[in-house]
Amino acid sequence: HNIDTSKIDLPITWNDEIFVPFDWGHFAFIYNSEKLKSPPTSFEELSDDKNSLSLIIQDPRTSTPGLGLLLWVKSIFKENSDEIWERLSPKIVTVTKGWSEAYGLFLEGEADLVLSYTTSPAYHIMAEEEKKYKAAIFNEGHYLQVEVAAITLKGEKNKLSRDFMKFILSENFQSVIPTTNWMFPVTDIK
């Protein structure tokens, strides 16, 4: 891509010649604290058959949060991942194609928790002045997602493509990420 990425500041080392990151966040299950007083603090608690928790998740074939959940579970439970999925299965109300549909169903009260990001409550606080939505913090930690952009082969010779890639790392672009995409910027903004 030949884009200067020296100002990128991520929780991981980034060395990629094709993809340029533009934001990042950690996956989490979001809940309504007025309805769910004791949220799960681990996948073990989430999948425990002694609770009646209900979940909405996204399809890993069509949604990056869905794929992120698959990888998150695999990173923690490795060869025992199937056991967690078996325990989670009866709790899953639906598997949506994407994040928007899943989050909308959650807001309508269709489930106790929805797969989203640790930053999702910030939207409700800042845009709606609503503090009841929280991220369930898991003892195992949370899986990182870095959203990226790339120049296609067709756009490789297009100056506008390269200019846009530079723009996504600019202060003007990065400074609006926290309150428009509700994720963390990849550069240090003021």
PLM region spans:
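Ligand-binding "clamshell"
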Residues: I8-E17, H124-I137
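Solvent-exposed loop/turn segments at secondary-structure junctions
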Residues: F27, E34-K37, R61-T64, T119-A122, ...
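Alpha-helix capping/helix-boundary segments
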Residues: A102, S120-P121, F173
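Mature extracytoplasmic/periplasmic domains
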Residues: T152-K190
